[in-house]
Design a protein with these regions (language model features):
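Internal alpha/beta scaffold segment
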Residues: 1-61, 65, 127
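General secondary-structure edge motif
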Residues: 4-7, 72, 99-100
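Extended active-site and interfacial segments that coordinate phosphate-rich ligands
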Residues: 8-14, 65-72, 134-147
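Alpha-helix initiation/capping motif
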Residues: 9, 19, 50, 66, ...
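Dual-mode signal for accessory low-complexity, basic/Gly-rich regions
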Residues: 24, 80-178
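Residue-level signal for secondary-structure boundary elements
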Residues: 32-43, 69-73, 172-177
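Glycine-rich, flexible loop/turn motifs
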Residues: 36, 54, 67, 73, ...
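Amphipathic alpha-helical
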Residues: 67-86
Length: 178
């Protein structure tokens, strides 16, 4: 069955972009890794998500922590400040002032000063992501996030993918989501 894969490079400095040859080779490798894929039966298995799946998962998490989702009560994480939602080894922070960062900014789209913040600390929700309107609706202070989050950083355990999957005799490695 035909498969497709992708790979890309992004940077503010064009000189730091990966070469077209490397990008093509990585896309080809990822495509080849999908050959022979097949459905599995329903079962309970340990799951490991590859790092390239993380942005999508983290994006859904951050959306659930947005002020709008909170005041509209449409989030699967309603009223979750201080609650543990992830393993203790996971922390998620926002660093809006990284020099050369793709999304670095001193102010959000409402003119509120941005600042470093922990969104999730040791698996617990530390901050919602608030613009001025949602902050007022929730009787909280704006977090400098009108227009979204910037330069998200995820602290996690230092194991490589190979180290994470080596103790698993039968499991599922998720490399892409639909």
């Amino acid at each position: 069955k035909m498969q497709k894969g992708y790979y890309y490079s992004s940077n503010r400095d064009p000189e730091l972009l990966e070469s077209a040859d490397h990008i093509g080779a990585m896309a080809a490798t990822r495509t080849e890794q999908k050959l022979g894929a097949k459905k599995i039966s329903t079962q309970r298995l340990p799951i490991v998500f590859s790092s390239r799946v993380a942005p999508g998962l983290i994006g859904h998490l951050l959306s659930a922590l947005s002020g709008k989702s909170q005041y509209e009560k449409t989030s699967f994480l309603n009223d979750s400040l201080g609650k543990k939602i992830l393993p203790s080894f996971v922390s998620i922070s926002e660093k809006p002032h990284i020099i050369g960062g793709l999304a670095s900014t001193n102010y959000d789209s409402e003119g509120v000063t941005t600042y470093n913040k922990e969104i999730v600390t040791n698996g617990e929700i530390a901050h919602y992501i608030l613009d001025g309107y949602s902050a007022r609706k929730l009787d909280m202070e704006p977090t400098g996030n009108s227009g979204g989050v910037t330069n998200i950083r995820i602290n996690h355990n230092d194991q490589s993918l190979a180290q994470m999957i080596s103790p698993i005799s039968k499991g599922l490695l998720v490399t892409e989501l639909m």
